[in-house]
Regions:
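C-terminal lobe and pocket-closing loops
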Residues: 113, 268-283, 293-388, 422-433, ...
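Glycine-centered hinge/linker elements that transmit conformational signals in sensory
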Residues: 175-177, 214-245, 291
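Extracytoplasmic "Venus flytrap"/periplasmic binding protein-like
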Residues: 51-123, 132, 157-159, 163-166, ...
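Short, well-ordered beta-strand elements
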Residues: 30-41, 60-65, 87-88, 187, ...
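Hinge/lid segment of periplasmic solute-binding proteins
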Residues: 93-146, 172, 200, 205-206, ...
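Short, low-complexity disordered leader/linker segments with a strong preference
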Residues: 1-35, 55, 357, 412, ...
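Extracytoplasmic/periplasmic solute-binding protein
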Residues: 133-142, 147, 172-218, 261
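Short, polar/charged alpha-helical segment
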Residues: 41-61, 386, 404
Length: 446
């Protein structure tokens, strides 16, 4: 086991007692307890559904622990090092590769093969793929998110357009027209430069991968990312987007409704926020649309969370029953009606609350084209490097050619350990085993 994991284990042993106490539940004789860690609002909502699961399965009790998102990653690593992980856990899709590389996740394909509930073909392809690491299924999607366009229908019509953009060229044309209409103190699009999701969404629409050489080096100097950066930076160069971070914007919902910007890229959670905060006179005057792509509606981020069973769980069968329960289309539909999270299964979208919602329809369309990000444990550090460098282009005037070179250098440093490990594995594969060496020597002697 790598030395850093040994150090992590030693550092975390002091937390073991705390985790053990927090995770223990008083269990009646003959009852199995499944420890389930969930995050934020989802943890609160799922507790309402757990009672139904326990009624269906009287021999199983579920101990739900609510982990704040801000502390979740550190707590999971601490628990891994201290052998204190739960049975079932909600994992962000970008965290799945990390815990898979730690060999902490149970392979789920055997469970899926005999399941009458979890049907891989019913899941959006890009979302399902986020849970397949090195060809092995290690999670089941729970809810999904992706980023697309929220837009003001009335202002777009005033600028002369009766439909949202479908291609990058159409988007450029519409933003230019909107800016001419808006004047100097209002804008076509709001793209907070302290975020990375916009750049990442656009980059996933390109054919070039973001990493190369078996995910050991950055590929940001590729033609695809250069096109992405040029398109993104041009929004600011033309004055279509303000050079502002989210902290400089008092309230994104208020600004949207007062016409500060016409387009805004965000996720499904904002459907409820915009509905709640919309002025009465603007009801029906805003909508959602799939992200434009280079040649038509484009790809987007395969975000959301998945349900996993940790490898050291002693309650794998009961844990799988819980995952199956939460994966039922009717349960997912109820989960959506309570919290607004979007379901990962196509069949769930037939529920009236989703099928009859025109604001959700664009997300349904976009989910057919989502793509997973590179499946490396360093990914969250890599996207922060991307954010830093693209902000330097927008704010500091860093030349785009220099920016992609700098970004590749930064990412190569982040991936240095992965590159070394990959090289060691390659060398080991080339070294003949003692038996094969003896056979070669014997053959030569003859």
């Amino acid at each position: 086991m790598p030395n850093w994991i040994d150090r992590l284990r030693r550092w975390a042993l002091s937390a073991l007692a705390v985790l053990a106490v927090a995770g223990c539940a008083r269990t009646e004789p003959g009852t199995t307890t499944v420890r389930f860690w969930a995050m934020g609002r989802e943890a609160e909502v799922v507790s309402e559904l757990i009672h139904e699961f326990e009624a269906e399965n009287p021999g199983i009790k579920v101990d739900v622990q609510n982990i704040p998102w801000t502390a979740a990653h550190e707590k999971l690593l601490t628990a891994f090092a201290a052998d204190g992980l739960p049975d079932v856990c909600q994992l962000g899709n970008t965290w799945v590769p990390e815990f898979a590389e730690l060999d902490a996740l149970t392979p789920l394909q055997p469970f899926v093969q005999r399941s009458t509930v979890v049907d891989p073909k019913d899941y959006f392809r890009g979302i399902w793929d986020t849970n397949v690491i090195h060809g092995e299924l290690v999670g089941v999607p729970w809810y999904v998110d992706t980023r697309l366009i929220y837009y003001r229908k009335d202002l777009l019509a005033k600028a002369g357009y009766d439909h949202p953009p479908r291609t990058w060229q159409e988007w450029d044309e519409q933003m230019a027209a909107i800016k001419r209409m808006q004047g100097p103190n209002r804008y076509a699009v709001l793209m907070p430069i302290n975020e990375f999701e916009q750049q990442l969404s656009l980059a996933l629409q390109q054919p070039d991968p973001l990493l190369r050489d078996d995910d050991t080096r950055g590929n940001f100097a590729s033609p695809g990312f250069r096109r992405t950066l040029a398109f993104y930076a041009n929004m600011f160069e033309q004055g279509w987007a303000p050079k502002m971070s989210e902290t400089q914007i008092s309230n994104v919902w208020d600004e949207f409704f007062r016409g500060f910007n016409v387009f805004y890229i965000s996720g499904p959670w904002n459907i409820r926020e915009f509905k709640k905060l919309q002025p009465k006179e603007l009801e029906g005057q805003w909508g959602t649309a799939a992200l434009p792509g280079p040649d038509g509606p484009g790809a987007g981020i395969a975000g959301g969370t998945s349900l996993v069973i940790f490898r050291k769980s002693q309650q794998k069968e009961a844990s799988w029953k819980l995952i199956e329960f939460l994966s039922r289309p009717e349960i997912q539909a109820r989960f959506h009606s309570i919290i607004g999270d979007l379901p990962p299964r196509r069949s769930t979208w037939n529920a009236p609350s989703l099928a009859n919602d025109p604001l959700a329809a664009a997300f349904r369309d976009q989910l057919e084209r989502v793509k997973p990000t590179p499946k490396v444990l360093e990914w969250e550090r890599i996207v922060q490097e991307m954010r830093i460098v693209t902000e330097k282009v927008v704010r500091g005037g860093l030349a785009q050619d220099k920016a992609v070179e700098e970004l590749d250098q930064r990412v190569d440093k982040v991936l240095a350990k992965r590159r070394w490990m990959h090289e060691q594995q390659r060398l080991q594969q080339r070294v003949p085993s003692p038996q094969s060496s003896s056979a070669v020597a014997a053959g030569s002697a003859q």
